[in-house]
Swiss-Prot record:
Cofactor(s) required for function per UniProt: FAD; (6R)-5,10-methylene-5,6,7,8-tetrahydrofolate
Coiled coil: none
Protein name: Cryptochrome DASH
Species annotation: Idiomarina loihiensis (strain ATCC BAA-735 / DSM 15497 / L2-TR)
Keywords noted in UniProt: Chromophore, DNA-binding, FAD, Flavoprotein, Repressor, Transcription, Transcription regulation
Function: May have a photoreceptor function. Binds DNA; probably functions as a transcriptional repressor.
Taxonomic path: Bacteria, Pseudomonadati, Pseudomonadota, Gammaproteobacteria, Alteromonadales
Length: 449
Protein backbone atom coordinates (compact mmCIF):
# COMPACT_ATOMS: atom_id res chain seq x y z
CA UNK A 1 0.00 0.00 0.00
CA UNK A 2 1.47 3.38 -0.97
CA UNK A 3 1.52 6.53 1.18
CA UNK A 4 -1.46 8.09 -0.57
CA UNK A 5 -3.60 4.99 0.02
CA UNK A 6 -2.50 4.86 3.66
CA UNK A 7 -3.52 8.50 4.12
CA UNK A 8 -6.99 7.81 2.73
CA UNK A 9 -7.59 4.89 5.07
CA UNK A 10 -6.09 6.62 8.14
CA UNK A 11 -8.52 9.51 7.64
CA UNK A 12 -11.43 7.09 7.27
CA UNK A 13 -14.77 7.69 8.95
CA UNK A 14 -15.00 4.21 10.48
CA UNK A 15 -12.60 1.91 12.29
CA UNK A 16 -14.22 -1.24 10.87
CA UNK A 17 -16.58 -1.40 7.94
CA UNK A 18 -18.55 -4.42 6.78
CA UNK A 19 -19.23 -4.76 3.06
CA UNK A 20 -22.03 -7.17 2.16
CA UNK A 21 -21.97 -8.49 -1.40
CA UNK A 22 -25.35 -9.38 -2.87
CA UNK A 23 -26.11 -8.89 -6.57
CA UNK A 24 -22.88 -6.93 -7.15
CA UNK A 25 -20.22 -9.66 -7.40
CA UNK A 26 -17.48 -7.51 -8.89
CA UNK A 27 -14.69 -5.19 -7.81
CA UNK A 28 -14.40 -2.86 -10.81
CA UNK A 29 -17.07 -0.17 -11.02
CA UNK A 30 -18.54 -1.28 -7.72
CA UNK A 31 -19.56 2.10 -6.33
CA UNK A 32 -20.68 0.66 -3.01
CA UNK A 33 -17.35 -1.12 -2.50
CA UNK A 34 -15.52 2.05 -3.51
CA UNK A 35 -17.40 4.01 -0.83
CA UNK A 36 -16.60 1.34 1.75
CA UNK A 37 -12.93 1.52 0.80
CA UNK A 38 -12.85 5.30 1.13
CA UNK A 39 -14.59 5.42 4.50
CA UNK A 40 -13.22 2.38 6.37
CA UNK A 41 -9.86 1.96 8.09
CA UNK A 42 -10.29 -1.83 8.03
CA UNK A 43 -12.87 -3.81 6.12
CA UNK A 44 -14.61 -7.18 6.17
CA UNK A 45 -16.10 -8.38 2.87
CA UNK A 46 -18.74 -11.09 3.11
CA UNK A 47 -21.41 -12.90 1.13
CA UNK A 48 -24.35 -14.61 2.83
CA UNK A 49 -25.57 -17.81 1.21
CA UNK A 50 -28.82 -19.30 2.39
CA UNK A 51 -28.85 -22.99 1.38
CA UNK A 52 -32.63 -23.15 1.68
CA UNK A 53 -32.75 -21.38 -1.71
CA UNK A 54 -31.92 -24.75 -3.26
CA UNK A 55 -34.87 -26.38 -1.48
CA UNK A 56 -37.63 -23.82 -0.98
CA UNK A 57 -39.12 -20.91 -2.87
CA UNK A 58 -42.38 -19.45 -4.16
CA UNK A 59 -45.23 -21.96 -4.54
CA UNK A 60 -43.16 -24.95 -3.46
CA UNK A 61 -40.61 -24.48 -6.25
CA UNK A 62 -36.94 -24.30 -5.13
CA UNK A 63 -35.69 -20.78 -5.75
CA UNK A 64 -32.32 -21.70 -7.25
CA UNK A 65 -31.58 -24.52 -9.66
CA UNK A 66 -28.28 -26.12 -10.61
CA UNK A 67 -27.39 -23.79 -13.47
CA UNK A 68 -27.65 -20.56 -11.50
CA UNK A 69 -26.01 -22.17 -8.48
CA UNK A 70 -23.03 -23.20 -10.61
CA UNK A 71 -22.80 -19.70 -12.08
CA UNK A 72 -23.00 -18.18 -8.59
CA UNK A 73 -20.21 -20.43 -7.31
CA UNK A 74 -18.01 -19.50 -10.25
CA UNK A 75 -18.73 -15.81 -9.69
CA UNK A 76 -17.85 -16.03 -6.00
CA UNK A 77 -14.59 -17.82 -6.76
CA UNK A 78 -13.58 -15.10 -9.20
CA UNK A 79 -14.61 -12.40 -6.74
CA UNK A 80 -12.46 -14.02 -4.06
CA UNK A 81 -9.48 -13.94 -6.44
CA UNK A 82 -10.05 -10.28 -7.33
CA UNK A 83 -10.26 -9.30 -3.66
CA UNK A 84 -7.12 -11.26 -2.77
CA UNK A 85 -5.23 -9.41 -5.52
CA UNK A 86 -6.08 -6.22 -3.59
CA UNK A 87 -5.12 -7.57 -0.17
CA UNK A 88 -8.65 -8.49 0.89
CA UNK A 89 -10.59 -11.70 1.44
CA UNK A 90 -14.11 -12.85 0.65
CA UNK A 91 -15.87 -14.53 3.56
CA UNK A 92 -18.74 -16.71 2.33
CA UNK A 93 -21.00 -17.61 5.24
CA UNK A 94 -23.88 -20.08 5.23
CA UNK A 95 -27.14 -19.18 6.92
CA UNK A 96 -29.88 -16.58 6.80
CA UNK A 97 -29.03 -12.97 6.00
CA UNK A 98 -30.49 -11.76 9.29
CA UNK A 99 -28.73 -14.26 11.56
CA UNK A 100 -25.33 -14.01 9.91
CA UNK A 101 -25.17 -10.23 9.92
CA UNK A 102 -26.67 -9.87 13.41
CA UNK A 103 -23.98 -12.11 14.90
CA UNK A 104 -21.20 -10.67 12.76
CA UNK A 105 -22.05 -7.07 13.65
CA UNK A 106 -22.23 -7.91 17.34
CA UNK A 107 -19.14 -10.10 17.58
CA UNK A 108 -16.85 -7.91 15.47
CA UNK A 109 -18.21 -4.57 16.74
CA UNK A 110 -18.74 -3.32 13.22
CA UNK A 111 -18.96 0.47 12.88
CA UNK A 112 -20.81 0.72 9.56
CA UNK A 113 -22.49 -1.45 6.92
CA UNK A 114 -21.97 -0.89 3.20
CA UNK A 115 -23.98 -2.55 0.46
CA UNK A 116 -25.54 -1.93 -2.94
CA UNK A 117 -29.14 -0.83 -3.34
CA UNK A 118 -31.37 -3.83 -4.04
CA UNK A 119 -34.73 -3.57 -5.77
CA UNK A 120 -36.19 -6.82 -4.42
CA UNK A 121 -39.03 -6.53 -1.91
CA UNK A 122 -37.86 -9.39 0.31
CA UNK A 123 -34.23 -8.29 0.17
CA UNK A 124 -35.27 -4.82 1.27
CA UNK A 125 -37.45 -6.31 3.99
CA UNK A 126 -34.47 -8.26 5.35
CA UNK A 127 -32.35 -5.13 5.38
CA UNK A 128 -35.09 -3.12 7.06
CA UNK A 129 -35.35 -5.65 9.89
CA UNK A 130 -31.60 -5.50 10.39
CA UNK A 131 -31.70 -1.70 10.52
CA UNK A 132 -34.41 -1.88 13.18
CA UNK A 133 -32.24 -4.22 15.23
CA UNK A 134 -29.26 -1.83 15.01
CA UNK A 135 -30.87 1.64 14.89
CA UNK A 136 -27.65 3.50 15.72
CA UNK A 137 -25.46 1.68 13.20
CA UNK A 138 -24.89 3.56 9.91
CA UNK A 139 -26.14 1.68 6.85
CA UNK A 140 -24.80 2.99 3.54
CA UNK A 141 -26.86 1.70 0.61
CA UNK A 142 -25.37 2.87 -2.70
CA UNK A 143 -27.11 2.90 -6.12
CA UNK A 144 -24.86 0.50 -7.98
CA UNK A 145 -26.81 -1.56 -10.50
CA UNK A 146 -28.61 1.05 -12.56
CA UNK A 147 -27.77 3.68 -15.15
CA UNK A 148 -29.28 6.44 -13.03
CA UNK A 149 -29.67 7.00 -9.34
CA UNK A 150 -33.09 7.83 -7.96
CA UNK A 151 -32.01 11.47 -7.57
CA UNK A 152 -31.11 11.64 -11.27
CA UNK A 153 -34.51 10.46 -12.49
CA UNK A 154 -36.63 13.31 -13.93
CA UNK A 155 -39.54 12.36 -11.65
CA UNK A 156 -40.18 11.13 -8.14
CA UNK A 157 -40.20 7.35 -7.73
CA UNK A 158 -43.87 7.55 -6.73
CA UNK A 159 -44.52 9.13 -10.14
CA UNK A 160 -42.73 6.43 -12.15
CA UNK A 161 -44.53 6.25 -15.52
CA UNK A 162 -47.02 3.43 -15.83
CA UNK A 163 -45.56 2.20 -19.13
CA UNK A 164 -42.07 1.67 -20.47
CA UNK A 165 -42.65 3.97 -23.45
CA UNK A 166 -43.45 6.89 -21.16
CA UNK A 167 -40.42 6.09 -19.02
CA UNK A 168 -38.09 5.84 -22.02
CA UNK A 169 -39.19 9.19 -23.44
CA UNK A 170 -38.38 10.87 -20.12
CA UNK A 171 -34.96 9.29 -19.47
CA UNK A 172 -33.49 9.02 -22.98
CA UNK A 173 -32.76 12.78 -23.18
CA UNK A 174 -30.79 12.67 -19.93
CA UNK A 175 -27.15 13.50 -20.46
CA UNK A 176 -24.94 11.09 -18.60
CA UNK A 177 -21.25 10.30 -18.72
CA UNK A 178 -21.13 6.55 -18.28
CA UNK A 179 -17.63 6.39 -16.89
CA UNK A 180 -16.54 3.47 -14.73
CA UNK A 181 -14.96 3.66 -11.28
CA UNK A 182 -11.78 1.61 -10.77
CA UNK A 183 -11.17 0.08 -7.34
CA UNK A 184 -7.42 -0.43 -7.19
CA UNK A 185 -6.86 -0.66 -3.44
CA UNK A 186 -8.90 -1.80 -0.47
CA UNK A 187 -8.46 -1.43 3.30
CA UNK A 188 -6.92 -4.40 5.05
CA UNK A 189 -8.75 -7.02 7.08
CA UNK A 190 -8.91 -6.43 10.84
CA UNK A 191 -6.23 -8.31 12.79
CA UNK A 192 -6.90 -11.70 14.40
CA UNK A 193 -10.12 -12.11 12.51
CA UNK A 194 -12.16 -15.21 13.26
CA UNK A 195 -15.77 -16.24 12.88
CA UNK A 196 -16.97 -18.30 15.85
CA UNK A 197 -20.38 -19.81 15.32
CA UNK A 198 -20.29 -19.47 11.56
CA UNK A 199 -19.87 -22.09 8.88
CA UNK A 200 -17.64 -20.82 6.11
CA UNK A 201 -18.81 -22.06 2.72
CA UNK A 202 -16.25 -23.92 0.59
CA UNK A 203 -16.25 -22.85 -3.04
CA UNK A 204 -15.86 -26.06 -4.98
CA UNK A 205 -14.35 -26.54 -8.41
CA UNK A 206 -17.30 -26.72 -10.77
CA UNK A 207 -17.59 -27.52 -14.43
CA UNK A 208 -18.40 -24.53 -16.59
CA UNK A 209 -21.73 -24.35 -18.43
CA UNK A 210 -22.27 -22.30 -21.59
CA UNK A 211 -21.73 -19.23 -19.42
CA UNK A 212 -18.82 -18.92 -17.03
CA UNK A 213 -19.51 -16.88 -13.93
CA UNK A 214 -17.25 -14.14 -12.65
CA UNK A 215 -15.98 -10.65 -13.31
CA UNK A 216 -13.09 -11.67 -15.57
CA UNK A 217 -15.35 -13.77 -17.80
CA UNK A 218 -17.84 -10.88 -17.93
CA UNK A 219 -15.25 -8.33 -19.01
CA UNK A 220 -13.79 -10.74 -21.56
CA UNK A 221 -17.23 -11.23 -23.10
CA UNK A 222 -17.92 -7.48 -23.05
CA UNK A 223 -14.70 -6.73 -24.93
CA UNK A 224 -15.25 -9.58 -27.37
CA UNK A 225 -18.82 -8.57 -28.15
CA UNK A 226 -18.03 -4.99 -29.08
CA UNK A 227 -14.88 -6.01 -30.96
CA UNK A 228 -16.77 -8.22 -33.39
CA UNK A 229 -19.67 -7.77 -35.79
CA UNK A 230 -22.50 -8.81 -33.49
CA UNK A 231 -23.20 -5.34 -32.11
CA UNK A 232 -23.80 -4.05 -35.64
CA UNK A 233 -26.45 -6.66 -36.42
CA UNK A 234 -28.19 -6.92 -33.05
CA UNK A 235 -31.52 -5.46 -34.19
CA UNK A 236 -31.79 -8.01 -37.01
CA UNK A 237 -30.69 -11.08 -35.01
CA UNK A 238 -31.94 -10.44 -31.46
CA UNK A 239 -35.06 -12.61 -31.85
CA UNK A 240 -33.21 -15.76 -32.91
CA UNK A 241 -34.10 -18.75 -30.77
CA UNK A 242 -30.78 -20.56 -30.54
CA UNK A 243 -27.69 -18.63 -31.65
CA UNK A 244 -25.21 -17.46 -29.02
CA UNK A 245 -24.06 -14.45 -31.06
CA UNK A 246 -27.58 -13.29 -31.95
CA UNK A 247 -28.00 -11.25 -28.76
CA UNK A 248 -25.63 -9.61 -26.31
CA UNK A 249 -25.78 -12.38 -23.64
CA UNK A 250 -24.82 -9.82 -20.96
CA UNK A 251 -27.78 -10.79 -18.77
CA UNK A 252 -26.21 -13.59 -16.64
CA UNK A 253 -23.35 -11.34 -15.55
CA UNK A 254 -25.67 -8.38 -15.05
CA UNK A 255 -27.98 -10.46 -12.87
CA UNK A 256 -25.19 -11.44 -10.47
CA UNK A 257 -23.54 -8.04 -10.74
CA UNK A 258 -20.30 -9.43 -12.23
CA UNK A 259 -20.74 -6.65 -14.77
CA UNK A 260 -22.34 -3.25 -14.26
CA UNK A 261 -24.80 -1.70 -16.67
CA UNK A 262 -22.57 1.40 -16.67
CA UNK A 263 -19.67 -0.69 -17.99
CA UNK A 264 -21.87 -1.91 -20.83
CA UNK A 265 -23.05 1.60 -21.70
CA UNK A 266 -19.48 2.92 -21.59
CA UNK A 267 -18.39 0.16 -23.98
CA UNK A 268 -21.40 0.84 -26.21
CA UNK A 269 -20.61 4.56 -26.38
CA UNK A 270 -16.97 3.74 -27.23
CA UNK A 271 -18.21 1.42 -29.98
CA UNK A 272 -20.48 4.15 -31.39
CA UNK A 273 -17.62 6.66 -31.28
CA UNK A 274 -15.44 4.33 -33.34
CA UNK A 275 -17.98 2.82 -35.73
CA UNK A 276 -20.87 5.28 -35.58
CA UNK A 277 -24.37 4.96 -34.18
CA UNK A 278 -26.78 2.63 -35.93
CA UNK A 279 -30.14 0.97 -35.33
CA UNK A 280 -28.55 -2.00 -33.62
CA UNK A 281 -26.49 0.04 -31.17
CA UNK A 282 -29.62 2.02 -30.32
CA UNK A 283 -31.56 -1.19 -29.66
CA UNK A 284 -28.90 -2.39 -27.24
CA UNK A 285 -29.38 0.76 -25.18
CA UNK A 286 -33.16 0.40 -25.64
CA UNK A 287 -33.10 -3.06 -24.04
CA UNK A 288 -30.90 -1.80 -21.20
CA UNK A 289 -33.54 0.84 -20.52
CA UNK A 290 -36.14 -1.93 -20.21
CA UNK A 291 -33.99 -3.45 -17.49
CA UNK A 292 -33.70 0.00 -15.87
CA UNK A 293 -37.45 0.48 -15.96
CA UNK A 294 -38.18 -2.81 -14.26
CA UNK A 295 -35.64 -2.03 -11.50
CA UNK A 296 -37.53 1.13 -10.53
CA UNK A 297 -40.87 -0.61 -11.17
CA UNK A 298 -39.98 -3.26 -8.57
CA UNK A 299 -38.70 -0.66 -6.12
CA UNK A 300 -41.87 1.39 -6.43
CA UNK A 301 -44.43 -1.41 -6.28
CA UNK A 302 -42.73 -3.67 -3.74
CA UNK A 303 -44.78 -6.72 -2.83
CA UNK A 304 -47.28 -6.06 -5.63
CA UNK A 305 -44.64 -7.41 -8.02
CA UNK A 306 -45.66 -10.88 -6.78
CA UNK A 307 -49.43 -10.30 -6.54
CA UNK A 308 -51.74 -12.41 -8.71
CA UNK A 309 -53.64 -9.30 -9.80
CA UNK A 310 -50.40 -7.35 -10.24
CA UNK A 311 -51.01 -3.65 -10.63
CA UNK A 312 -54.34 -4.06 -12.36
CA UNK A 313 -56.35 -4.97 -9.27
CA UNK A 314 -58.17 -7.58 -11.37
CA UNK A 315 -57.29 -11.25 -11.02
CA UNK A 316 -56.66 -13.07 -14.33
CA UNK A 317 -59.12 -15.77 -15.33
CA UNK A 318 -56.56 -18.49 -14.79
CA UNK A 319 -55.98 -21.14 -12.16
CA UNK A 320 -53.52 -23.91 -11.34
CA UNK A 321 -53.63 -27.31 -13.00
CA UNK A 322 -50.85 -29.50 -11.69
CA UNK A 323 -50.62 -31.75 -14.74
CA UNK A 324 -50.51 -28.84 -17.19
CA UNK A 325 -47.85 -27.13 -15.11
CA UNK A 326 -45.66 -30.23 -15.01
CA UNK A 327 -46.03 -30.75 -18.76
CA UNK A 328 -45.08 -27.15 -19.43
CA UNK A 329 -42.04 -27.42 -17.16
CA UNK A 330 -40.79 -30.57 -18.86
CA UNK A 331 -41.57 -29.49 -22.43
CA UNK A 332 -44.37 -31.99 -22.93
CA UNK A 333 -47.23 -29.84 -24.28
CA UNK A 334 -49.12 -29.93 -27.60
CA UNK A 335 -47.00 -26.97 -28.78
CA UNK A 336 -43.64 -27.96 -30.35
CA UNK A 337 -42.05 -24.50 -30.17
CA UNK A 338 -42.88 -24.29 -26.46
CA UNK A 339 -41.52 -27.78 -25.81
CA UNK A 340 -38.25 -26.98 -27.55
CA UNK A 341 -37.80 -23.75 -25.60
CA UNK A 342 -38.51 -25.42 -22.26
CA UNK A 343 -36.13 -28.29 -22.96
CA UNK A 344 -33.46 -25.76 -23.89
CA UNK A 345 -34.08 -23.93 -20.61
CA UNK A 346 -33.89 -27.09 -18.53
CA UNK A 347 -30.70 -28.25 -20.22
CA UNK A 348 -28.80 -24.95 -20.29
CA UNK A 349 -30.39 -22.50 -17.85
CA UNK A 350 -30.91 -20.05 -20.69
CA UNK A 351 -33.63 -19.18 -23.19
CA UNK A 352 -33.85 -16.39 -25.75
CA UNK A 353 -36.04 -13.39 -25.08
CA UNK A 354 -38.38 -14.43 -27.88
CA UNK A 355 -38.58 -17.93 -26.42
CA UNK A 356 -39.47 -16.54 -23.00
CA UNK A 357 -42.32 -14.53 -24.48
CA UNK A 358 -43.69 -17.56 -26.32
CA UNK A 359 -43.61 -19.99 -23.40
CA UNK A 360 -45.07 -17.38 -21.02
CA UNK A 361 -47.87 -16.57 -23.46
CA UNK A 362 -48.64 -20.28 -23.79
CA UNK A 363 -48.57 -20.70 -20.02
CA UNK A 364 -51.13 -17.95 -19.42
CA UNK A 365 -53.36 -18.12 -22.49
CA UNK A 366 -53.25 -21.67 -23.90
CA UNK A 367 -52.81 -23.50 -20.60
CA UNK A 368 -54.76 -20.98 -18.45
CA UNK A 369 -52.25 -21.24 -15.61
CA UNK A 370 -51.53 -18.84 -12.76
CA UNK A 371 -48.64 -16.74 -14.10
CA UNK A 372 -46.87 -16.71 -10.72
CA UNK A 373 -46.02 -20.41 -11.01
CA UNK A 374 -44.35 -19.76 -14.36
CA UNK A 375 -42.38 -16.87 -12.91
CA UNK A 376 -41.29 -19.04 -9.98
CA UNK A 377 -40.12 -21.79 -12.33
CA UNK A 378 -38.12 -19.25 -14.33
CA UNK A 379 -36.61 -18.03 -11.06
CA UNK A 380 -35.39 -21.54 -10.38
CA UNK A 381 -34.10 -22.36 -13.85
CA UNK A 382 -32.74 -19.15 -15.37
CA UNK A 383 -29.04 -18.54 -15.05
CA UNK A 384 -29.77 -14.83 -15.54
CA UNK A 385 -32.65 -14.59 -13.07
CA UNK A 386 -33.26 -11.00 -12.00
CA UNK A 387 -36.14 -10.39 -9.62
CA UNK A 388 -37.49 -7.24 -11.26
CA UNK A 389 -37.08 -8.24 -14.91
CA UNK A 390 -38.45 -11.74 -14.36
CA UNK A 391 -41.55 -10.92 -12.33
CA UNK A 392 -42.15 -7.65 -14.18
CA UNK A 393 -42.08 -9.37 -17.56
CA UNK A 394 -44.39 -12.14 -16.38
CA UNK A 395 -46.87 -9.54 -15.15
CA UNK A 396 -46.56 -7.86 -18.54
CA UNK A 397 -47.39 -11.09 -20.42
CA UNK A 398 -50.22 -11.93 -18.02
CA UNK A 399 -51.86 -8.55 -18.62
CA UNK A 400 -51.58 -7.35 -15.02
CA UNK A 401 -48.44 -5.23 -15.27
CA UNK A 402 -46.92 -2.45 -17.34
CA UNK A 403 -48.48 -3.39 -20.68
CA UNK A 404 -50.93 -0.66 -21.77
CA UNK A 405 -52.80 -3.17 -23.97
CA UNK A 406 -53.45 -5.45 -21.00
CA UNK A 407 -53.34 -8.62 -23.10
CA UNK A 408 -50.23 -10.04 -24.75
CA UNK A 409 -50.97 -13.32 -26.52
CA UNK A 410 -48.76 -14.76 -29.25
CA UNK A 411 -50.00 -16.96 -32.07
CA UNK A 412 -47.66 -19.93 -31.58
CA UNK A 413 -48.16 -21.31 -35.08
CA UNK A 414 -47.32 -18.00 -36.74
CA UNK A 415 -44.38 -17.45 -34.39
CA UNK A 416 -43.02 -20.88 -35.34
CA UNK A 417 -43.35 -20.07 -39.05
CA UNK A 418 -41.50 -16.81 -38.53
CA UNK A 419 -38.69 -17.83 -36.19
CA UNK A 420 -38.26 -21.54 -36.92
CA UNK A 421 -39.60 -22.03 -40.46
CA UNK A 422 -37.57 -25.19 -41.11
CA UNK A 423 -38.18 -26.65 -37.65
CA UNK A 424 -34.43 -26.73 -36.99
CA UNK A 425 -34.79 -25.45 -33.44
CA UNK A 426 -37.70 -27.77 -32.68
CA UNK A 427 -35.80 -30.79 -34.03
CA UNK A 428 -32.62 -29.85 -32.16
CA UNK A 429 -34.50 -29.83 -28.85
CA UNK A 430 -36.93 -32.67 -29.66
CA UNK A 431 -39.94 -30.41 -29.27
CA UNK A 432 -42.38 -32.12 -31.64
CA UNK A 433 -44.66 -34.38 -29.61
CA UNK A 434 -47.47 -34.80 -32.11
CA UNK A 435 -50.91 -35.44 -30.70
CA UNK A 436 -49.91 -34.79 -27.10
CA UNK A 437 -53.11 -33.84 -25.19
CA UNK A 438 -53.15 -30.99 -22.71
CA UNK A 439 -54.92 -33.04 -20.04
CA UNK A 440 -55.20 -36.70 -19.15
CA UNK A 441 -57.75 -35.92 -16.41
CA UNK A 442 -60.57 -33.40 -16.20
CA UNK A 443 -61.21 -30.75 -13.55
CA UNK A 444 -62.63 -33.41 -11.21
CA UNK A 445 -59.56 -35.64 -11.76
CA UNK A 446 -61.53 -38.16 -13.82
CA UNK A 447 -59.57 -39.65 -16.74
CA UNK A 448 -60.14 -38.00 -20.11
CA UNK A 449 -61.17 -40.68 -22.61
Amino acid sequence: MNTKQQLVFIMADYRLGLFVFRNDLRVEDNLALYEAAQRSETLICCFCFNPTQNKYGHYGIPAMGKHRFTFLQQSLKQLRTELEMRGQKLIVLTGTFDRILTELISERQVDAIFLSQHQGYYERLQLGLLQQRFPFLPFHETPNNTLFSEQELPFELADLPETFSQFRKKVEPLSRNFSVQPVNALPSLPKNISYPGFKAETLNELASDDFEGGERAALTHLTSYFSGESAGTYKQTRNALDDFSSSTKFSPWLAQGCLSVRQIMAALRAYETEFGENESSYWISFELLWREYFFWYALKHGKRLFAFSGLSGKSPKTSFYSERFQKWCSGNTPYPIVNACMKQLNATGYMSNRGRQLVASCFVHELSLDWRYGAAYFEQQLIDYDVSSNWGNWQYLAGVGADPRGHRQFNLEKQTERYDPDNEFIERWAGDLSGQPIDSVDAADWPVR
